[in-house]
Amino acid sequence: MQENLVIVESPAKAKTIEKFLGEDYKVMSSYGHIRDLKKKELSIDPKTLEPDYEIPDEKKKLVSELKSNAKKAKKIWLASDEDREGEAISWHLCEVLGLDEAKTNRIVFHEITKSAILDAIKSPRHLNMDLVNAQQARRVLDRLVGFKLSPVLWRKVKPALSAGRVQSVAVRLIVEREREIQAFHSEPYYRINALFGITNADGSQSEVKAELDTRFKTHEEAVAFLEQCKDAKFAVSNITKKPLRRTPAPPFTTSTLQQEAARKLGFTVSQTMMVAQRLYESGRITYMRTDSVNLSSLAINTSKDEIIKLWGKEYSKTRNYHTHAKGAQEAHEAIRPTFMSQTEIDGTAQEKRLYELIWKRTAASQMADALIDKTTVTIDIAGSQAKFIANGEVVTFDGFLKVYRESTDEDDNNQEEATHMLPVMQVGNVLERREITSTERFSMGPIRYTEASLVHKLEELGIGRPSTYAPTISTIQQREYVQKGDKKGEERTYTVDTLKGTKVTSRERKEMVGSEKGKLLPTDIGIVVNDFLMANFPDIMDYNFTAKVEQQFDQIAEGKEEWNTMMKVFDKSFEPTVDKVMNARSEHKAGERQLGKEPETGKPVFVKIGRFGPVVQIGSADDTEKPRFSQLPSDKSIETITLEEALELFKLPRTIGEFEGSDVVIGAGRFGPYVMHDKKYVSLPKGTDPMKVTLEEAIQLIGEKREQEQKRHIKAFNEDAKLEVLNGRYGPYIAYDGKNYRMPKALHEKAAELSYAECMEIVNNAPEPKGRKRK
């Protein structure tokens, strides 16, 4: 009989831990949850609201192996993660394996190091059923909402849609932000900057840059001010010097890591969590799902030693951080390296970059303040109440800035100029006017969410927890309620007026504004579903309700509330609302909007969500003639399309001529307008009006597409037309019968020389696609 069986969540973790514990311990993995609610049923008792769990088919063999090994072990250690999900995994293991509590130990650790694992073995505890119940409450509530709301969407909006408690609120945030942007009207204003000269004590000249403390609303006011400055004198009236301290940001929580990795490394939220999971399981960092900023005394002391070794005592400052997040869970530490002495690691490029970010943030949190001298100089203008202000900063001690500087979402949108070092000045110094410039600027509207800023907003509102941010953001994109995309900028003209000498000159300049990359944009279906849920289920969509639910989960986790009581109270009001909405009659489906009538026939023109997405429809089902439909191009929105734009879609497809014996046709599909020739399609460039494309322009696009295809095509085979060697983003690959096959790198250079037999050997020996395994 084996002495000890340790069960962890993931196989990677199992391998690492087995090395630490020795021969008396066998370590196995549960690969995440071993049972769950049934997939195709509510799986919840309608009266008691008790969940009905099942072991999925793909887990039955594993469960059998775990049972067999559990029977052989004298003692069992459940070592799933120390959060609500991890506690629930351990409880399910107890239930399914029929474990005896007397010989079952629950152990937890925040890092996978030998000392942490051995310490956990020395201090086991029992299962915490309050944490289990909090997880069950979340799982059951989310199943009730999703399972009961989704059929309502199928009937009232479109088949195959789904709703979720947190995901729907996340979509609401994105839809509302988009509408704020559409409603915003930018207002112009005029900023005045000056360049002055001053003679130094040694006779040399220095420049002083300053900005007027007043901004003008009109061009006329700005020019009038420049005219006023022609004969004015400029003198220093006040100088203030102020020492500033900048303190470092605390160590990473889950959400701040996701935000900084997005800003600094360009990682998606899911990518960050996937890489962090690997770093944790390989013993490089502490547990990555946490809302705590605390550091252990060991981490603080080892950080101090490393900082002193690398930069000296003056750079070290011990700091203790305390968590202020609403409902911060359990006693986790912040995310930090397990060994601060390990400044670099082996691993993938992504692992190295994320580890470096975590290491720097942790080190900076234990470093001295940055010391800065800030000087503000006020410059009077003779004959005017307005004043110029010159700001200068000098970093006298860089402190934590030597290692790390925190980013913000506004970094890319900051229009203000950086501060400068200033020459020595005294009150009464007269400055020489060299140039004063008025620049037309425009008020900044709201900016769209990135994945990182959405995480920040969800956390700010108390919606979700560290374990839910990444899945929520992935889900709303997978379900196509939201898409990550770029917004093309627009060219804008602005005026610049400059006073130099005695002359004011005016000129126009152009700039690109409004271009955005990697922002979260609501789709038409996302907008329609959001509006339907807001109209019919306002409580579910309310930010305060969602945050209150999270607080109730916290109360359950602390043993202050019964989980099934919470479920019954919720379902008592939710179920009647679902029935009422499901049975309500309506002439139109949600999202349907009448734009007007077709002038020639008088038939109504609608825009709505069709089976395959947004469509424009002319006529109704009751008419003698069948309605006509046109897919809405991706650059048009169901909310903003006009009657004129909708009618234009029905002028397509149109034949514009002939090329090489085949018609050249301009059409429009779901992904925008296109050219069709000889059964091949070429997308029109963004912004191109399909009604104005000439035959010559279409032929040029066809030629460019052919060139691209020639570069992509390496080899074809007479033996089988379905087999090709193609050039892709990552080099040559084989395409056969609609599937792609990876080519060994050793063959890349001679891809064009491969025989039919060699290619088919690669196809026939290709590994089966791996199914996704749970953690």
Question: Where are these predicted regions, by residue range?
Answer:
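Basic, low-complexity terminal or inter-domain segments flanking catalytic cores
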Residues: 2-5, 16, 25, 150, ...
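A conserved hydrophobic secondary-structure block that centers on an alpha-helix together
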Residues: 258-260, 264-271
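C-terminal or mid-to-C-terminal helical accessory/interaction module adjacent to the motor/catalytic core
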Residues: 112-196, 241-245
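Intrinsically disordered, low-complexity regulatory segments
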Residues: 1-140, 148, 408-409, 419
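Flexible beta-alpha connector loops of hexameric P-loop NTPases
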Residues: 51-56, 264, 461-462
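Short glycine-centered, acidic/aromatic-flanked micro-motifs in structured strand/loop junctions
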Residues: 80-82, 259-261, 289
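Positively charged, polyanion-binding regions of nucleic-acid-associated proteins
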Residues: 231-247, 259, 435-444
